[in-house]
Amino acid sequence: KTLKEKWPLWITGTILFSVVYAISSFITWAVILAVVLFVAWLATKNKNMSLSLAFTVVALIGFSTHLYIPIRSELNPIIDENDPEINFRDENGKLILKNFNPNGENWRAFYDYLERKQYGSESMLSRAFYRRAQIDNQILVFPHMSYGGYQIAQYLPYKVGKVSYYQKGIYAIEADGNEPLERGPFKFPTLMASIGENELAQALIFLLFNGLLIWIVVIAWRKNLIVGIYLSLLYSICSAGLIWYINFSDGTKLERRDHASWVKEMDYVTSRFAEQGMVTSVTRTPDPNELLDIQRKIYADRAKGENSSKHEQNFAWQNWRKIQAMFQSAGLQSPPLPDPVHLEVRERDYFYAPAYIFMSLLYGLGIGFLLLNIQQRKAHMLNPSGIAIAVLCGAIPLFANYKEHNRANLWVPWDYAYNLLMSCEPNAIVFTNGDNDTFPLWFAQEVAGIRKDVRVVNLSLGNTDWYIKQMLDNPPILKLSHDKAGIDREFALSETNFNLPQQRIDYWVDLAEERIPRFMRRIESLSARLDSATTAADSANINAEIEKLNHPLQIFTALRNWGVPRRGGMMQTQYKLVIDLALNNPDKPIHLSTTVGLSNAVGLDRYMVQKGMILDLAKGNFAIAKDSIDIERTAYLVDSVFKFRGLGDGTAYVDGETRQLLYNYNSIYMRLAMSMKDVERAVHYADIGIKQFPEEWRNYAVAAEMLLSGGEVDKAIEYLERGLKEVSSSSGNRYLLQQLNSLNAKE
């Protein structure tokens, strides 16, 4: 009866929950609901109507905080992800009344932003129904994402740790990245190092933490059923609901869009084979996630020395082998397994903040129950017990987490951005990879005003139409071969243009093979004219024309060489963007951040020279040596320009993600050391690496190698012995020990 009387609350809750399942209709429904409830309340004075109206008004006020997003976007800031502005006026400043309709197309970009579609075209709710990770990795203990692992880390000095991926979707737990947490004389191993391969232990610890919460809720149920239901539902939504909704990836499965794209691509290829009369016994395209799972099991069996034939005989795996065989019989390179979506790029504990805050409230309630029990049984122990519990509740999390959360002297991201930008030539275009190597650069440019002449192009965002369009408007303005309509129509890959020929790599290979001879003929013709030039001015003009032609020839040559072994694949938008920007901006230096995988350079890396923290395209230069480094420019940057505040002196805490980023510094030092002919200068750069990264064994090995080349055996031995004391990784230690034993044996 009570539930029936509260029907307005149930209807109101269902409609207001549309902020999750139909965000584009939320404002319309909520406003209509508010009007209806207000009229109903005036007519009935029903308290359930008034409470429902209050909920609706508060929900609208809460949602209104997001309106700063389109207001900010309307001002066209340089960093304007998804471009979510809402245009209420035309170019002449007149109001457009239809644009006030919150269900209109004018609001679409705003809603897409709220649904995080700047990271993909799929809504968060839709994505939640396609699991992007193994469920145990999402719930128990796993790096960057696990609810249970972060739950433990809230209170205890046991951090989650890391895994290393050495094949697609296949990971291992290694010592590197799982260094124990030191607190005075105590060392606390990471959860991955201690129980990473023991799911039973993970489950037991998870049950311990959450069993206490269940116990607290059960007590609440016994004392007040309604309060108990409220607490259990709220915590379930904050925890299990968030795990399901956020749906973090563990690096073992594909994104839904990539899954659909790969299956569609394989269907297309196999149908082409069938049209060409090739015999095929492939009954259906295998599920790529299933293939990755089978491959993981095969590797696991082989690592244990067990027979993996039961997995290799799987129907899906056999179909995949047949597809690979068809490619080989057609004279094409066998397609590899698709790349799963990467493991979450950073720690995602902040997404679970509502659950952990509410969890703490429940633990506090449980402590209250405990103290109440103490008062009833041993009243004289109440005050001492309360004080002890209060002190422990504050001291343990402080002990576990203070060092990692103290930001004092943490200059590393600022200096990293400065160093990368200062590596760039004036007015350059520099391609970056993801968040960690991009946002610090944007901060340095827009907040600190450093090197705003450099255009940072993020390749992850380079797959989105809105980001590419902004390059045509926001300074530094770039030139593209398409206008905004063309970007939508054919440049940015989407479901509407998926079947266009230019979305296939073979189209671009054919284009390159058609353009290359044309450019070469023109260059040969100009070279012939150069031989007969009579004045220095004529020679200079002809050389300038040849240089202009060498630039696109170089780009198309790189594209062809990159594309031939990938002919059967899709031409991702970011690949087209790299080629397009390089072709249409000949006056701008083209750089690639050293954080970017070379495969993303679409073959241009073959003609690039490392200068500090970037690879610079040597335009039109076909004679450039592979993996070249400009020694003098890089040495000048390291010695006279770069900043390294807090590195090597113990003043800055460097977490795992930052350490991985900073290893780009170390690769520079090692390349410089190995490229120097002067032993003293070579050891100088190895010493910089040792100072900043004392646990990196390669620095000691390089220093010893350089000293040996100069005949300084004793000093080489000193470096190897020093490395053995500092280096904790077993593989590095073994190498240094092997080198040391070899030198001692010779003596």
Regions found by a protein language model. Name each.
Residues 1-293, 300, 317-427, 443-744:
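ER/secretory pathway lumenal C-terminal domains and tails of membrane proteins involved
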Residues 305, 309-320:
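Extracytoplasmic/lumenal ectodomains and periplasmic regions of secretory and membrane proteins
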Residues 439:
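Residues that form or flank phosphate/diphosphate-binding pockets in enzymes
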